[in-house]
Amino acid sequence: MTIHETLAADAHGEKAIERQSVYVYEAPVRIWHWINAFSILTLALTGYFIGSPLPSVPGEASANFLMGYIRFIHFAAGQLLAVFLILRVYWAFVGNVHARQIFYVPFWSGRFWKEWLHEVGWYTFLVRQPKKYVGHNPLPQFTMFLMFTLPLLFMAITGFALYSEGAGRDSWEYSLFGWVFSIWPNSQDIHTYHHLGMWVILVFVMVHIYVAVREDIMSRQSIISSMISGERLFKDRED
């Protein structure tokens, strides 16, 4: 939805004049964003060392439990991510329209693809002026769904499936996620895909940070501060 199509509304939902500042991201969305960022950073660091362990240290295991702590932190961060992902899905149903943008792409909409192409031109410096959107514009919405939402769900499912190997067949993890082994009977395959999923998300994170900084500067609308205050500020008005 572009800024031209969005009117401020009062408490009764009546149309009012267009504003330069629009409340976009509700508090639960912002809290989830930063907890999710912390969880992903923790999972990426600990997951890397789980896949590429540190050199063995001689001595009793009880005195050299570093890898055990790394695994524990990884499992704890994974469960934190999963809990808040469930809460985030819930908020997509009860929150405002912007709260559900990352969970779907309107593939059926010709207008979506037309504006998607315009944004591709803007990001590749082929278009001089961007359109202003209150929420996500079509290109980030498309990218977040394919390179973040779906991979995040995949990582949660495969992560709990791998955890169930140690928890045992009588665990709730195996009861809910044991079916993954019917798709990939070889546990190493799941480890490999889980590892590759991490890199997909990390590539997305790097692009996400670059685009957020770029848009804050070039498109003259607040991006980074919006995920702190919830308000999107348009620094100049389109005629």
From Swiss-Prot:
<comment type="similarity">
    <text>Belongs to the HupC/HyaC/HydC family.</text>
</comment>
<dbReference type="GO" id="GO:0009055">
    <property type="term" value="F:electron transfer activity"/>
</dbReference>
<protein>
    <recommendedName>
        <fullName>Probable Ni/Fe-hydrogenase B-type cytochrome subunit</fullName>
    </recommendedName>
</protein>
<dbReference type="GO" id="GO:0005506">
    <property type="term" value="F:iron ion binding"/>
</dbReference>
<dbReference type="InterPro" id="IPR016174">
    <property type="entry name" value="Di-haem_cyt_TM"/>
</dbReference>
<keyword id="KW-0813">Transport</keyword>
<dbReference type="GO" id="GO:0005886">
    <property type="term" value="C:plasma membrane"/>
</dbReference>
<feature type="transmembrane region" description="Helical">
    <location>
        <begin position="196"/>
        <end position="213"/>
    </location>
</feature>
<feature type="transmembrane region" description="Helical">
    <location>
        <begin position="31"/>
        <end position="51"/>
    </location>
</feature>
<dbReference type="GO" id="GO:0020037">
    <property type="term" value="F:heme binding"/>
</dbReference>
<comment type="function">
    <text>B-type cytochrome involved in electron transfer from hydrogenase to oxygen.</text>
</comment>
<keyword id="KW-0349">Heme</keyword>
<feature type="transmembrane region" description="Helical">
    <location>
        <begin position="75"/>
        <end position="95"/>
    </location>
</feature>
<keyword id="KW-0408">Iron</keyword>
<dbReference type="InterPro" id="IPR051542">
    <property type="entry name" value="Hydrogenase_cytochrome"/>
</dbReference>
<keyword id="KW-1133">Transmembrane helix</keyword>
<dbReference type="InterPro" id="IPR011577">
    <property type="entry name" value="Cyt_b561_bac/Ni-Hgenase"/>
</dbReference>
<dbReference type="GO" id="GO:0022904">
    <property type="term" value="P:respiratory electron transport chain"/>
</dbReference>
<keyword id="KW-0479">Metal-binding</keyword>
<feature type="transmembrane region" description="Helical">
    <location>
        <begin position="142"/>
        <end position="163"/>
    </location>
</feature>
<keyword id="KW-0812">Transmembrane</keyword>
<keyword id="KW-1003">Cell membrane</keyword>
<keyword id="KW-0472">Membrane</keyword>
<dbReference type="InterPro" id="IPR000516">
    <property type="entry name" value="Ni-dep_Hydgase_cyt-B"/>
</dbReference>
<dbReference type="Pfam" id="PF01292">
    <property type="entry name" value="Ni_hydr_CYTB"/>
</dbReference>
<keyword id="KW-0249">Electron transport</keyword>
